[in-house]
Amino acid sequence: MRELRERPLGAGLRVAIVAARYNEMLVGHMIEGAREALLEAGVKDDDILLVRVPGAFEIPAVARRLADTGQLHAVVALAVVLRGETYHFQVVADACAEGLQQVALQGKVGIGFGVLTVDTVEQGLARAGLKQNKGEEAARTALEMARLLTAI
């Protein structure tokens, strides 16, 4: 009997994880979650590139540059933006989201948006690994979008 099997979602794909160094404890959990999800999906470890940037604000510029190389299929963006006492939180969160949306609209790579905007460290912990891991979710989304963009 012949069996048709779908190849793993990540097989043959090259993926970058662009992660902020700010809020390292939380982002570190997300990086591990993203990496594990990519490996489980069939992405080879050698096909995963980790790029660290200072903070969330810097992610879109690096994601755009990576997309423009034509060497990657997907970019997973990871950061935690923690609300403070000033408007800075909103500026950084909005700039990061808008910048990544612009990269996504280019249609060159699948984008996984794993940028958490939280009010407290506890909320960050819950979303970065204790109860769920948004890094894993962002990685799976990036792979799905990469496959979809390739198929169109």
Label every PLM stretch briefly.
Residues 16, 49, 73-77, 109-115:
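Structural motif
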Residues 3-54:
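Glycine-rich phosphate/diphosphate-binding loop of Rossmann-like nucleotide-binding domains
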Residues 28, 32, 60-64, 136, ...:
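Amphipathic, non-transmembrane alpha-helical secondary structure
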Residues 2-4, 89, 94-152:
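C-terminal binding/interaction regions
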Residues 21-22, 53, 79-81, 115-120:
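Short, ordered loop/turn segments at secondary-structure junctions
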Residues 58, 62-100:
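Glycine-rich phosphate-binding loop
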Residues 24, 36-44, 64-71, 101-105, ...:
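Generic secondary-structure signature for well-ordered alpha-helical cores
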Residues 35, 39-40, 47-71, 87, ...:
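Amphipathic alpha-helical hairpins
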